[in-house]
Amino acid sequence: MTSNSQTIIQEIRQEFEMLLDFVSGDQAQQATADQIERGLFKLLLALGAKLLLLFFAMRSDICSREAISTAAGDTLAYERDTKRNYYSIFGKLPIWRPYFYKPGLGGEIPLDAALALGEDSYSDLLREISEYLGVYNVYHKTGDILARLLGLKVSTGAIESNMAEDAADVESYYAQKPAPDPAEEAEILVVQADGKGVPLVLEAPPEPPVRLGKGQKRGRKKEAMVTSVYTIAAQVRTPQSVVDSFFQQSPTASARQQSPSRSRPQHKQIWATLAGKDAALTRLADQVAPRDGEHIGHRVALCDGYEPLQRRMSKYFPDFTLILDFIHADEYLWEVANALLGEQHPQRLEWMAEYTLKILSSQTDQVIATFQQMAQDQQYKAKQRAQLAKTATYFQRNLPYMDYATYLKRGWPIASGVIEGACRHFVKDRCELSGMRWTQLGVENLLRLRAVAENGDWDDYHQFRKRQRHRRLYDQPYPQQLPLEMQAIENNSSFESRPDAATSQGLDPIPAPDDQAGYYHLPLAV
């Protein structure tokens, strides 16, 4: 052990004594809980920095300075110790490593491989925390959170750059990820697709005007194609039960008794890309193929009435039953109700319930005939007749995909709530904040990492990413985690090993963490 390591150890012991005095000394007797908690957090960060610095110093101490052999059989002599900076959650730290070199061959730093360091200065933990925050918050707010919480200054550019680098392996991760166990799947395989516009910056913007004209915008929108695949258990419903639920009407007692618990999607996977419909559906088909099999009894494809999307869904999923999203169909009924009765008419809801029941009972052809006849009746205003004709035409074109009575009898889903929610939450809520404009590459990187987070693959993906990076940089397998390190990482609380620590003092026991709680899936909650 070098004198430098000994010095660091002495400083750590002094700082630990300071920690003890901070919580038990004379001044602590007059302090508030908030003062102690805030001060303790800062002191622990400083202590963590010293401990991590000691770790690096000791690893450098034990690293051999003897000449090394390269993979090609060449010999590199020890040249000097060289420094690199390491930005950790505890702050900026120096790492000194032995550097081996031979003129004409270049140099190597074996300790970088042993420590599994990346190409830049940011630690993997800091990257993962900032990126997890970044997929849900604007980048400058992510920097503000890190500054307030950890006292770190991470620029918006650094966050965006790290996300771009770490999103590069998402496609290969999902390509190698095995399909869910058939025993964990339900019998209905469902695919959904829809589009959502994302505001982009102009690639070659003209000279910006002093003031925008009416209708002018500083950017343009490009469609992000959002896709989803999952399995779900059959849930048989009647048209009337759906109407009762949809319009919040009070069901009868017998209907309540017969109503089953709501089925939930199993192993739902979502994705979004601006590369176009064909690229999105090709990838979706690749995801679907390994999940299909004898355990799947039904195959359903849900989308809205947009013809180009319907044609592509039929092309890429020919064995699936294409269903028009019932919510989109019902929106056309609402437009007719508003045109005929007005939004404040007391009988509008009753009219909607009546015609919705007809649609769900697969009597859409009768509704079409009624609307077409009304559209020819001159007693109605021109706008009313136009809306009747528009809705009738829409229903006529989508009639092959509107056999809702059969779908409900088989227990199939008829509404694309999963994909509608994904378009809103997955894309809109992050990409369409006020004044926000994206480059296509920037939003693709964000959406890839956002998909990893939303699909529940965050930790697994970053383990994969680190292994892939290690092979690229050092052409060797990623170092195995030692049992002691795994124990420290997996140990959520020292109180778990001392369950009587609280009860022995007459206090309520501290509950064990709930593995299902979202908090404990955050990178900081280890």
Residue ranges and their predicted role:
Residues 1-57, 97-526:
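Catalytic center-proximal scaffold of phosphoryl-transfer enzymes
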